[in-house]
Amino acid sequence: MWIQVRTMDGKETHTVNSLSRLTKVQELRKKIEELFHVEPQLQRLFYRGKQMEDGHTLFDYDVRLNDTIQLLVRQSLALPLSTKERDSELSDSDSGYGVGHSESDKSSTHGEGTADGDDKTVWEDTDLGLYKVNEYVDVRDNIFGAWFEAQVVQVQKKALSEEEPCSSSAIMAPEDDIMYHIKYDDYPEHGVDIVKAKNVRARARTVIPWEDLEVGQVVMANYNVDYPRKRGFWYDVEICRKRQTRTARELYGNVMLLNDSQLNNCRIIFVDEVLKIELPNERSPLIGSPSRRKSGPSCQYCKDDENKPCRKCACHICGGREAPEKQVLCDECDMAFHLYCLQPPLTCVPPEPEWYCPSCRTDSSEVVQAGEKLKKSKKKAKMASATSSSRRDWGKGMACVGRTTECTIVPANHFGPIPGVPVGTMWRFRVQVSESGVHRPHVAGIHGRSNDGAYSLVLAGGYEDDVDNGNFFTYTGSGGRDLSGNKRTAGQSSDQKLTNNNRALALNCHSPINEKGAEAEDWRQGKPVRVVRNMKGGKHSKYAPAEGNRYDGIYKVVKYWPEKGKSGFIVWRYLLRRDDTEPEPWTREGKDRTRQLGLTMQYPEGYLEALANKEKNRKRPAKALEQGPSSSKIGKSKRKSTGPATTSPRVSKKSKLEPYTLPLQQANLIKEDKGNAKLWDDVLSSLQDGPYQIFLSKVKEAFQCICCQELVFRPVTTVCQHNVCKDCLDRSFRAQVFSCPACRYDLDHSSPTRVNQPLQTILNQLFPGYGSGR
């Protein structure tokens, strides 16, 4: 296993080899010291937001193959200065002589004085102001920006200070110095609020007929910001569009909010309730009981029905509205809770400035602070490796490193070939086969479900009863072995049963399930099984690959039956026959196709570099022995003669790859897709010097939907030349988002979206069946 270690500034990166999942953090620090020349006590290691501490293993932090760990170098602690050195370094500013207050001190002192002056502002009652006591007005809220109905309770002005001259201009207080004490009509429980004069105006009471509404006119209308089709609050609206048909009237405007912000092109639903904005002193003050405007309920669930329990606007646990003074609000979800409804109940309102309910509160005991040890994981404590008394280092196997990527182009229960994986594709390790989606389990030989069927299997020669004849083979079921103690394999110790994966593989046979075995009436009608051959099967079969794992195509179950195996126990046998249009990879046609597609052995990222570094480190001691003073000519000749034999056979010289040529039909379809001509030019350039697999990866990257992050299915090419799945774009339109998901370009949602058929045809040919499950 190997990982990457990178400094925080990103300037230096090294690969650390020869690691295990059970490698301790303190052991990792020693390896890092050899590469970065940083002492272990000066190293701070970070992985996925956690600081790695000594005593834990890489498995505890879930560090996987080729992951990156960040290194932060601590500054070495300097020794304290002596008394003489410290006195000699003191300057005049340090000693405090001849220097007044600093700029920060001045600003802070000035700020305190200003605050005191504001707190000492004196307000007194006055008869001035545009609106008098008991007059009904409209008041703008500082949170929503909407206008609410209210009544003036008191009017105050800023009192004159002794320093201000008593002039006529001072006697006539400006409107900015007027403060109104108001009481909301719809919210009497809020009591009296104090608002500035700029947020108060005369009560709107005149309904503007539809015929008198004009574009550019500023009116007051009802609008719901969260739910545009429902009744909401009253806002100032600038009319931008007016349209009338035989059956409907449409009014659009810009809804004005706080701080000159606005919502553009909003449709006003209630066109018969548009009100005129009253100007100051335009009409007589409104003192009598006016008619009330209709506003939307503050709670969309209970519609402000006080007799109806509601867990949204009342107590979130019991739904009761009683005892509001004994309710506390959560600062995260804004839900109310009775003190006595909480578990455990509270005796009083918490004095903390911020309080969180049990659902929103973060358990501080689960938070790992910097420098703390990890919390014990219940999941890892139940693993066989945690309870085993064996000292074997199981963390070096490639089956333990975990997947770095996952196949999402088709679901896990997909029958048939994986799109983009041709017959003859080779991988060095089983974990890579899992990442490609051909066979997802890391260790198990059969991937399937007992109520659905088997999707894939690996022929690795693990059972002595297996017989491989290439186009057909006899496969032995799983089970009947004691794998306790985290074993990977063992001898047959009991009879196999037709359950779990054995039953799943039997379901692929085109015949009703039978506990005594069955044979397919038409074996080609059975469910397909992907077959992967492993190099371990070479001891029993000549069709196994020389290295790694190889995908050999689609097979189908002809029959299955129980019989006594070589071990003396009952085993389930399955006869599978090949049913694939692509040629077998061991035939001449298959080898030619493999060479044509440029299919080569795939290694994990960083594997060849790690192998080369390992060989390089192995040769260093040998070279030191050659250059030693005690070495003789005979010794040198022996060392030189054995040198070539020590080189790894795995690092082989790459053969020259033939450039892949697209079929004529696909080339013509690419020419038809003129909207993506630039993308296709970049993708086709990879065919010149890269294998077919790189070409497919380029296609996936170029035509990935930005919404679902998958290869586009039923693609829609927008006018801004971006490709999105039709379902994703329709979902965006239903959410009233009419812009391109990639660049926010405004799209025409009035016309139906059209699928790019040439692009869809190409993708179906390159990735057949990739639309399964979508």
UniProtKB/Swiss-Prot annotation:
Residues 83-120, 616-657 are annotated as: Disordered. Pfam families: PHD, SAD_SRA, TTD, ubiquitin. Residues 463-466, 475-478 are annotated as: Required for formation of a 5-methylcytosine-binding pocket. It catalyses: S-ubiquitinyl-[E2 ubiquitin-conjugating enzyme]-L-cysteine + [acceptor protein]-L-lysine = [E2 ubiquitin-conjugating enzyme]-L-cysteine + N(6)-ubiquitinyl-[acceptor protein]-L-lysine. The modification N6-acetyllysine is found at residues 396, 542. The record marks 488 as: Required for affinity and specificity for 5-mCpG sequence. The tudor-like regions specifically recognize and bind histone H3 unmethylated at 'Arg-2' (H3R2me0), while the PHD-type zinc finger specifically recognizes and binds histone H3 trimethylated at 'Lys-9' (H3K9me3). The tudor-like regions simultaneously recognizes H3K9me3 through a conserved aromatic cage in the first tudor-like subdomain and unmodified H3K4 (H3K4me0) within a groove between the tandem subdomains. The keyword DNA damage applies. The record marks 486 as: Required to discriminate between hemimethylated DNA versus symmetrically methylated DNA. Residues 129-205 are annotated as: Tudor-like 1. It comes from the Eukaryota. It comes from Rattus norvegicus. The modification Phosphoserine is found at residues 76, 91, 93, 95, 161, 284, 295, 365, 511, 631, 641, 648, 751. The record marks 324, 327 as: Histone H3R2me0 binding. There is a cross-link at residues 276, 382, 542, 656 (Glycyl lysine isopeptide (Lys-Gly) (interchain with G-Cter in SUMO2)). The gene is Uhrf1. Residues 330-334, 350-352 are annotated as: Histone H3R2me0 binding. Residues 1-78 form the Ubiquitin-like domain. Residues 442-443 are annotated as: Required to promote base flipping. This is E3 ubiquitin-protein ligase UHRF1. It is found in: Nucleus. Keywords: Acetylation, Cell cycle, Chromatin regulator, DNA damage, DNA repair, DNA-binding, Isopeptide bond, Metal-binding, Nucleus, Phosphoprotein, Repeat, Repressor, Transcription, Transcription regulation, Transferase, Ubl conjugation, Ubl conjugation pathway, Zinc, Zinc-finger.
